[in-house]
């Protein structure tokens, strides 16, 4: 029994070292993370440039989100649909703002990342809820899929997609509800873990690191389950909701979640920091410099995705904006009538 317990602990430590590698940087002096006034008054030249670009990117993203909000408010007539879209509109500005604030206030980098991921997880459930709404409810959702003989295919990311043969399931209300719960559990679990982490840090200080590592592994498992659930549902609905640009909307949120949550642990921690490719600075250690650069990259990525969303989800080819097409038809009719009147006048 003791041998099995030791093996399990070794496996957990190995997974933890992959997720949160130890700081192997050769910083000569150890110091506390600087406050925002201290950091902003002693910026290095490259940090000034990155902050300037990040502030510009964040401003553009916020302006684009206001434009998106206006179009949803004006051209989406169904209030329930509007309220769901408001959540999704805020994805890019929330991620961009969290990253920019974390650049300016280094002490908040970890907590703002947690808050940003929590918002993303809530938006994943909003996407599932939006798909159910567009079908007219869960019963109609299930009936439509069964009528088209579309079973639930479990070969979805992050891991099941590499398994060649998996059994399918009937698209019943019960199975759809189970997939919805796979997505809904993620924000609930993340909220509980954030609360427990705050309590652990407040009570145990530096000794809370092992507990935070295990809680991060639990939240990662919860996140992967949510990604599996939302991908499985999205793939089933892709053909039926193409007029609403649903898959484009889902892919944009999915890719931005990947950028926001996976770059820091996978690229910066497990590659750049592990091999000492990011060094210490006068005020920030290697880990904090990694967060700074990663947050800058996220602001740029959110700007690109926001511009892409403006083009891909435009009302002119998106049935989600149900009040936009009648106005277009009215304007086209008015234009044709004016042309007819002018031709009649010229004939006379």
UniProtKB/Swiss-Prot annotation:
Bilayer topology annotation: Multi-pass membrane protein
Glycosylation sites: 26
Extracellular compartment segments: 1-49, 106-109, 202-213, 262-291
Cellular component terms per the entry's GO annotation: membrane; plasma membrane
GO molecular function: transmembrane transporter activity
Domain of life: Eukaryota
TM ranges: 50-70, 85-105, 110-130, 181-201, 214-234, 241-261, 292-312
Keywords: Cell membrane, Glycoprotein, Membrane, Transmembrane, Transmembrane helix, Transport
Record Pfam families: Solute_trans_a (PF03619)
Primary residence: membrane
Subcellular location, record wording: Cell membrane
Presence of keyword Electron transport: no
Cytoplasmic face of the membrane: 71-84, 131-180, 235-240, 313-348
UniProt function note: Probable transporter.
Similarity comment: Belongs to the OST-alpha family.
Name listed for the protein in its UniProt record: Organic solute transporter alpha-like protein 3
């Amino acid at each position: 029994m003791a041998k099995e317990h030791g093996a399990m602990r070794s496996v957990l430590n190995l997974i933890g070292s992959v997720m949160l590698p130890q700081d192997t940087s050769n910083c000569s002096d150890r110091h506390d993370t600087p406050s925002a006034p201290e950091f902003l008054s002693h910026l290095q030249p490259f940090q000034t440039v990155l902050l300037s670009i990040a502030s510009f990117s964040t401003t553009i993203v916020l302006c684009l989100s206001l434009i998106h909000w206006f179009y949803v408010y004006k051209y989406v007539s169904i209030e329930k649909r509007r309220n769901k879209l408001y959540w999704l509109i805020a994805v890019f500005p929330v991620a961009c703002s969290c990253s920019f604030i974390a650049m300016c206030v280094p002490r908040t980098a970890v907590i703002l990342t947690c808050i940003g991921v929590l918002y993303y997880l809530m938006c994943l459930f909003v996407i599932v809820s939006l798909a159910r709404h567009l079908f007219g409810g869960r019963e109609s959702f299930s009936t439509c899929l069964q009528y088209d003989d579309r079973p639930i295919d479990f070969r979805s990311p992050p891991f099941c997609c590499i398994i060649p043969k998996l059994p399918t399931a009937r698209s019943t209300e019960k199975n759809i509800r189970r997939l919805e719960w796979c997505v809904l559990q993620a924000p609930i679990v993340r909220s509980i873990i954030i609360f427990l982490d705050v309590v652990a840090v407040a009570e145990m200080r530096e000794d809370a690191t092992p507990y935070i590592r295990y809680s991060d592994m639990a939240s990662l498992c919860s996140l992967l389950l949510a990604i599996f659930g939302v991908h499985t549902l999205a793939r089933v609905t892709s053909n039926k909701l193409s007029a609403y640009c649903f898959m484009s909307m889902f892919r944009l949120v999915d890719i931005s979640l990947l950028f926001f949550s996976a770059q820091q642990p996978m690229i910066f921690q497990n590659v750049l920091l592990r091999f000492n490719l990011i060094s210490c600075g006068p005020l920030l250690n290697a880990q904090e410099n990694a967060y700074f650069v990663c947050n800058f990259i996220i602001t740029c990525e959110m700007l690109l995705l926001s511009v892409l969303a403006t083009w891909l989800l435009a009302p002119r080819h998106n049935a989600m904006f149900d009040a936009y097409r009648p106005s277009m038809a009215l304007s086209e009719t008015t234009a044709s009538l004016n042309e007819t009147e002018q031709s009649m006048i010229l004939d006379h």
